[in-house]
């Protein structure tokens, strides 16, 4: 049976399916490692939902109760609109568009939702202690239906308080100026540290009784329930790690999740970026800061991967010549590295995606993000081959190229070289783009 790449389609979204090429060739031990790491990836989902908006989890769970209730008619226009809205929430990890960050509102009415909520089993709804269904509706409906309330997840408009006008859930009752001053003081106190910490990366900044403090995301702190589940599966993964170096960095990641200590996170990043022998690798943690208007807080994400051996040969050819590209880069010499350190590049197959990486995932990744670690220890670049393959295969037959390509000769060139050129472009971007260059002294 021919593999079908296209799946469900709704709103402005087309879901794709992807293959796990080469999975059967992995050893049983490697497959177990992928399974355990995949379980650790799945348990981070609700962290991302909460980070993307204070009300996301309750809205999702409320609508899931309605969606699963067999007593409510499923063949009405309103129910179909509710289904599409819920699918969009699942896709975007909340009520904000996954790319534009603007809030999308339901195409069903408040009256309809109020009516069906009165018919479901109230014990299944995400009610707070002592809260009635009516009180829940009064709190959540304005967030869902009023376009003027919390309209954007990440706001970067000039002249606005970016923290107060962004719906992302990294700050509580805190202004932009207060947050910037809080972390500026931390960085100033740590100015002489040759291994600086990524202050604010793994915490929610709150103000209580006029005092600012961090609620750290760790096993006995905020998001503790999900993190403890992640730790459990990481501990299982320890027993089937591919080598001692991998076992060591998994142990450090567990220690980081248990303590919330950013110094441990630095040590984990250094060991992770230095391990190159395993076929199976993963990302699990609070990584990218694009979801925070101040660029400090890490959104949770997970990725489990294994090497695409054939395609990796081409990326390693690029990475082995990283110094040549650095030397010949058309930029000011002040921004060039004299010696390029540890640029590694692999083409991988994604076995499991989670959090910010799911379901709208990157096609290439370069980590770690800390500039000082990259400068001293290098970085890992990956191109995700089975995701790019799904994009390419799903796009065929749409008629787009036939309509807009200028002539038949050009069309034939695109058909022959288009996919591989796209892959080379991603390789160059991740490996040489993110892996090259240096900052001026004193610039963060």
State where each predicted segment sits:
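Compositionally biased, low-complexity linear motifs
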Residues: 38-51, 252-267, 443
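Post-signal peptide N-terminal segment of secreted/secretory-pathway proteins
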Residues: 64-80
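N-terminal-proximal low-complexity accessory segments that begin disordered
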Residues: 2-68
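Active-site-adjacent bridging/hinge elements
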Residues: 10, 34, 395-408, 434-444
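Surface-exposed patches in mature extracellular/periplasmic domains of secreted proteins
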Residues: 46-49, 74, 245-249
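Active-site recognition of the HExxH zinc-binding catalytic motif
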Residues: 27, 243, 424-439
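Contiguous, non-catalytic segments that form substrate-binding/exosite surfaces or channel walls
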Residues: 84-414, 418, 422
């Amino acid at each position: 049976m021919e593999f079908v790449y296209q799946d469900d389609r709704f709103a402005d979204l087309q879901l794709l399916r992807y293959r796990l090429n080469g999975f059967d060739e992995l050893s049983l031990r490697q497959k177990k490692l992928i399974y355990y790491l995949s379980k650790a990836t799945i348990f981070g989902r609700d962290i991302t939902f909460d980070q993307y908006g204070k009300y996301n989890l309750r809205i999702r769970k409320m609508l899931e109760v309605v969606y699963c209730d067999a007593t409510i008619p499923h063949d009405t226009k309103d129910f179909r609109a509710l289904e599409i809205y819920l699918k969009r929430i699942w896709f975007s990890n909340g009520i904000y568009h996954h790319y534009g960050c603007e809030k999308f509102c339901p195409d069903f009415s408040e009256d309809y939702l109020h009516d069906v909520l009165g018919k479901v089993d109230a014990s299944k709804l995400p009610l707070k202690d002592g809260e009635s269904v009516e009180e829940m509706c009064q709190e959540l409906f304005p967030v869902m239906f009023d376009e003027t309330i919390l309209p954007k997840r990440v706001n970067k408009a000039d002249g606005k308080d970016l923290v107060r006008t962004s719906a992302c859930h990294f700050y509580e009752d805190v202004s932009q100026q207060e947050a910037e001053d809080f972390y500026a003081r931390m960085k100033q106190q740590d100015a002489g540290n040759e291994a600086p910490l990524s202050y604010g990366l793994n915490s929610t900044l709150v103000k209580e009784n006029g005092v600012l403090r961090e609620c750290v995301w760790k096993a006995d702190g905020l998001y503790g329930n999900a993190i403890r589940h992640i730790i459990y599966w990481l501990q299982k993964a320890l027993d089937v790690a591919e080598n001692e170096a991998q076992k060591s960095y998994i142990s450090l990641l567990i220690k980081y999740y248990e303590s919330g200590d950013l110094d441990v996170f630095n040590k984990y990043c250094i060991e992770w970026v230095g391990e190159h022998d395993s076929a199976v690798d993963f990302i699990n943690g609070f990584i990218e800061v694009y979801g925070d208007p101040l660029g400090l807080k890490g959104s949770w994400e997970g990725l489990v991967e294994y090497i695409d051996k054939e395609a990796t040969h081409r990326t390693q050819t690029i990475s082995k010549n990283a110094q040549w590209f650095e030397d010949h880069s058309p930029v000011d010499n002040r921004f060039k590295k004299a010696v390029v350190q540890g640029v590694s590049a692999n083409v991988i197959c994604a076995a499991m995606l989670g959090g910010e990486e799911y379901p709208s995932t990157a096609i290439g990744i370069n980590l770690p993000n800390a500039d000082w670690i990259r400068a001293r220890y290098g970085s890992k670049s990956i191109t995700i081959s089975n995701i790019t393959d799904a994009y390419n295969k799903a796009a065929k037959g749409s008629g787009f190229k036939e309509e807009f390509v200028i002539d038949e000769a050009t069309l034939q060139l695109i058909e022959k070289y288009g996919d591989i050129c796209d892959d080379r472009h991603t390789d160059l971007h991740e490996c040489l783009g993110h892996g090259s260059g240096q900052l001026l002294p004193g610039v963060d």
